[in-house]
């Protein structure tokens, strides 16, 4: 007998697994049943069973899928699950692999919630850029919750313990039931009507089922939270519960106590921080003073301080150098200016009227001298000529003639008589000799 016709257990399980995978009806199965053997495992995969009146099937829900479940599963709870069927090879058993789980009977609510969430998300109500920063030191805090629940008590106790300065004002509202949404909106509008009276608002309630928390998923409540003029902290249900108020609020707290902690600083921590900063500031200042003192001592003990004049040696030398440069520069400028002045003066003199006048004066003097010399020469010549003429005249002068013994005669009128025709008898005539005159009377005229 040969072994070839016998399958191994692994081969058989693999074959059956492939049958399950290739069956289109088992790829995505919608299953309803009652939770059985459910034991919550924190941060782990969940293993339980689903059963009805006649049958039971083992279920595995991996952590990545279970973290998305929006309610708290409990033993005996009827649920809707979606997943696929496959074989677990090591044990040779088939089981259901759940990918989604909802409480039975709440599917319509979940669908409504998803649709509203998608609508508001599309409008941008949940966008991070709309989230406002919580004030660090609030003066007044408004709280919207039930007046009779533990929420307001936890908030006031925590806030008074952490930051007694803050004033807590309750705006009571119904947090469950058909009229809860209207009551919540009315309370928030009362707060908004007071403008900037409040620094922050807390809205919340304790845990409950999806139906119990449904008023915090109503559209008018969510929009009013978004429209509040101050930052809003939402604390609705337990940590596993998430409402649309949580998504639209500026901050979400898992518990009322956590909400109060978000809203207020811890005064003791702040004082401790102040004291720490004060100590660091004093230490820093003291360290700075010590450093400055050490530096001052080093400066006081330096050679420069012991011989202060050395502090200015380089500066004095630099001043001397600059002074010499300045003097040289001034001298050069003066020399250049003088040279330019001389050149300009020479050029001016070359075209100056004074020089021309001086030349003309010089020429005048020369011409005057030449004229004077010429005049003297001319006069000398004329004197010589005059002397000759005088000599000639003197030679021909009547006086000379008189000296030779001749006389000349004038009548009584002083006219010279040169002819006997000018004389009559009894005329009185003056006879001029070289040394005198003689008056004579004509007694006779002869020719």
From Swiss-Prot:
InterPro entries: Exonuc_VII_L, Exonuc_VII_lsu_C, OB-fold_nuc-bd_dom. It is an enzyme of class 3 (hydrolase). Its main location: cytoplasm. Keywords: Cytoplasm, Exonuclease, Hydrolase, Nuclease. Its EC number is 3.1.11.6. GO terms for biological process: DNA catabolic process. One of its GO terms (molecular function) is nucleic acid binding. GO terms for cellular component: cytoplasm; exodeoxyribonuclease VII complex. It is found in: Cytoplasm. Belongs to the XseA family. NCBIfam families: xseA. Bidirectionally degrades single-stranded DNA into large acid-insoluble oligonucleotides, which are then degraded further into small acid-soluble oligonucleotides. Heterooligomer composed of large and small subunits. This is Exodeoxyribonuclease 7 large subunit. The gene is xseA.
């Amino acid at each position: 007998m040969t072994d070839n016709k016998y399958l191994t257990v692994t081969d058989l399980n693999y074959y059956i697994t492939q049958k399950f995978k290739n069956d289109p009806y088992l790829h995505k199965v919608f299953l309803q049943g009652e939770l059985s053997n459910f034991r919550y495992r924190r941060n782990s995969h969940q293993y339980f069973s689903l059963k009805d009146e006649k049958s039971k099937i083992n279920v595995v829900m991996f952590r990545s899928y279970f973290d998305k479940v929006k309610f708290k599963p409990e033993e005996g709870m009827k649920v809707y699950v979606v997943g696929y069927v496959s074989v677990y090879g090591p044990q040779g058993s088939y089981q259901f692999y759940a990918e989604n789980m909802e409480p039975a009977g709440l599917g319509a609510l979940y669908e409504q919630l998803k649709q509203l969430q998608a609508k508001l998300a599309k409008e941008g109500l949940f966008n991070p850029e709309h989230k406002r920063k919580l004030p660090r030191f609030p003066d007044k805090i408004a709280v919207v919750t039930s007046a009779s629940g533990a929420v307001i008590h936890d908030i006031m106790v925590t806030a008074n313990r952490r930051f007694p300065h803050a004033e807590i004002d309750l705006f009571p509202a119904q947090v469950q039931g058909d009229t809860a949404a209207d009551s919540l909106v009315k309370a928030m509008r009362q707060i908004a009507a007071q403008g900037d009276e409040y620094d922050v608002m807390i809205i919340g309630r304790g845990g409950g089922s999806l139906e119990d928390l449904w008023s915090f998923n109503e559209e008018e409540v969510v929009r009013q939270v978004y429209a509040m003029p101050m930052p809003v902290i939402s604390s609705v249900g337990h940590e596993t519960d998430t409402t649309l108020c949580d998504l639209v609020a500026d901050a979400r707290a898992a518990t009322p106590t956590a909400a109060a902690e978000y809203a207020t600083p811890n005064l003791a921590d702040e004082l401790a921080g102040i004291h720490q900063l004060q100590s660091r500031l004093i230490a820093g200042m003291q360290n700075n003073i010590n450093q400055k003192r050490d530096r001052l001592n080093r400066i006081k003990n330096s050679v420069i301080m012991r011989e202060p004049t050395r502090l200015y040696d380089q500066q004095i030398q630099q001043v001397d150098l600059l002074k010499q440069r300045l003097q040289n520069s001034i001298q050069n400028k003066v020399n250049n200016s003088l040279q330019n002045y001389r050149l300009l003066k020479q050029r001016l003199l070359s075209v100056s009227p004074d020089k021309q006048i001086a030349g003309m004066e010089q020429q005048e003097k020369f011409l005057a001298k030449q004229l004077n010399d010429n005049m003297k020469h001319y006069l000398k010549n004329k004197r010589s000529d005059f002397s000759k003429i005088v000599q000639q005249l003197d030679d021909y002068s009547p006086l000379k003639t008189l000296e030779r013994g001749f006389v000349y005669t004038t009548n009584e009128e002083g006219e010279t008589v040169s002819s006997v025709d000018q004389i009559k008898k009894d005329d009185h005539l003056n006879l001029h000799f070289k040394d005198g005159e003689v008056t004579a009377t004509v007694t006779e005229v002869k020719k």
